[in-house]
């Protein structure tokens, strides 16, 4: 994915950016800019390196003070939406930290064309009071700005600087999430769910308490809670299970839990058959299977896969067949040897079988 994004910062993009910046400022040294950007190292530069390299060269070849540079960028930003537009907030991140108020206004503007979620983070680390600005943004009419108020303060945002102060104490974030948990835009409330999921990894009880407070509020908030608690649900946390009505699993009998093959080659797939029956009163069940993958060092690592969540009537019986694939992925390398697969009902492992990869 990084390779694909890297290629968005193409020679054509650099040429278009050069023309547009020159159109908006006669001070811009377009010839030196394009020569220095597309240097001998350009082809080998990775994603973030290309982005930082471009913003550095804008700064070097636009001989104005910072605020006047931003005025020029403000005229160009609307032409470069999407990922390539991140060079504009990146410019603010690299060169605007000593002019907070002006820079924050620029980030608020630029996020409406790409995203300022990465660029805002050094400002939050530098000055924790900026969380109050993000709270104000949570009331903004523009949904991109509202999303930034949540996404920008996620403690563990992927590809981004970790915000240690919120990993340690996420309470300053909560007023923003309280305000946005029922937002009309899914782009916004998805960010709330992801922020809470980040928090749950270090403060599970805090997120569970919020869950009790928010449950039943609306369909949107129910969706937010389910996704906010996804890590705890996969871990089988009983309080998270109970919040969604998944309690005792004793009445669900496992009639069959089997793999079509117990010996497979790496790259092959097989089928998993699950036959179950509810022998008790009607109840909700969350069904998952977990594979214990053999690691290179000889230990095992569990990965949980959801099958379904549904209510079973008394005496209801079901047979489920799932495809289980063992081809290597960019995120998972398989190793020959003993593996395990187990069935989880309402977060509790119920049955485990062994199989071998070769």
Q: Language model features by range: what are they?
A:
Residues 328-338:
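Short glycine/proline/serine/threonine-rich loop/turn segments at secondary-structure transition edges
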Residues 269-277, 281-297:
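Beta-strand-rich binding/interaction modules
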């Amino acid at each position: 994915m990084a390779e694909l994004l890297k290629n968005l910062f193409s020679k054509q993009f650099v040429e278009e950016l050069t023309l547009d910046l020159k159109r908006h400022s006669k001070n811009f040294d377009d010839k030196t800019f394009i020569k220095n950007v597309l240097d001998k190292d350009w082809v080998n530069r990775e994603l973030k390196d290309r982005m930082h390299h471009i913003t550095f060269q804008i700064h070097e070849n636009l001989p104005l003070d910072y605020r006047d540079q931003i005025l020029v960028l403000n005229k160009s930003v609307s032409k470069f939406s999407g990922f390539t537009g991140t060079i504009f907030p990146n410019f603010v991140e690299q060169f605007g930290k000593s002019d907070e108020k002006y820079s924050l206004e620029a980030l608020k503007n630029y996020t409406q064309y790409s995203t300022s979620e990465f660029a805002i983070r050094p400002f939050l680390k530098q000055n924790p009071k900026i969380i109050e600005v993000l709270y104000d943004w949570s009331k903004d009419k523009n949904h991109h700005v509202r999303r930034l108020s949540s996404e920008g303060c996620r403690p563990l945002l992927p590809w981004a600087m970790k915000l240690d102060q919120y990993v340690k104490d996420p309470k300053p974030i909560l007023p923003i999430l309280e305000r946005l948990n029922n937002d009309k835009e899914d782009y916004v409330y998805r960010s709330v769910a992801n922020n809470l999921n980040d928090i749950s990894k270090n403060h599970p009880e805090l997120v569970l308490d919020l869950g009790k407070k928010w449950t039943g509020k609306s369909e949107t908030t129910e969706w937010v809670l389910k996704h906010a608690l996804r890590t705890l649900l996969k871990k089988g946390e009983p309080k998270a299970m109970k919040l969604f009505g998944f309690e005792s699993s004793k009445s669900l009998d496992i009639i069959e839990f089997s793999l079509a093959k117990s010996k497979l080659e790496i790259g092959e797939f097989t089928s998993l058959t699950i036959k179950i029956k509810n022998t008790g009163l009607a109840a909700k069940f969350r069904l998952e299977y977990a594979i214990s993958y053999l690691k290179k060092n000889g230990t095992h690592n569990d990965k949980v896969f959801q099958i379904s969540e549904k209510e079973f009537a008394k005496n209801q019986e079901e047979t489920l067949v799932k495809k289980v694939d063992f081809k290597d992925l960019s995120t998972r390398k398989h190793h020959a040897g003993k593996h395990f697969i187990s069935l989880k009902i309402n977060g509790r492992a119920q049955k485990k079988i062994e199989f071998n990869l070769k």
